[in-house]
Amino acid sequence: PTMAHVKDGWQVNDEWYLFTRFQDQSMHILALLDPGAERTLQDKYNVPNYPVIWCSAPGKGRVFYNAMGHREDVWENAEFQAMFSDAMTWTKGEGEADAAPNWAEAAPADLDPVSGAARVAAAAENNLPAK
């Protein structure tokens, strides 16, 4: 229910974090980032599409994570606002708690949760070619 107001192909111009480790065994991926043209700007951004919004439900709790919203204008986006409102409703226990891990189904096959993105980032930091 947290993504009910976000359409497929939703686009936002924002700064984003390059994650190097994921908790793939507990993540329920809700949205993937497509770095688009950024892939060609620096080797460290030449990564597969990867999770930027996810949730989990450890025990009786609920966790929602969103890596977006660095730019002020993103917070003015109606879909972004609706998503956060829905997410806060969900995290306080309302609605279905379906947050089963879905890494195998949702993440690109070439995104390794432990070493894939980390290898690219480490190579860029050390001025080495990414492999």
Predicted regions mapped to residue ranges:
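Extracellular ligand-binding/catalytic regions of CAZymes and related secreted enzymes
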Residues: 36-53, 57-131
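Catalytic beta-strand/loop cores that center a nucleophilic Ser/Cys/Thr
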Residues: 1-59
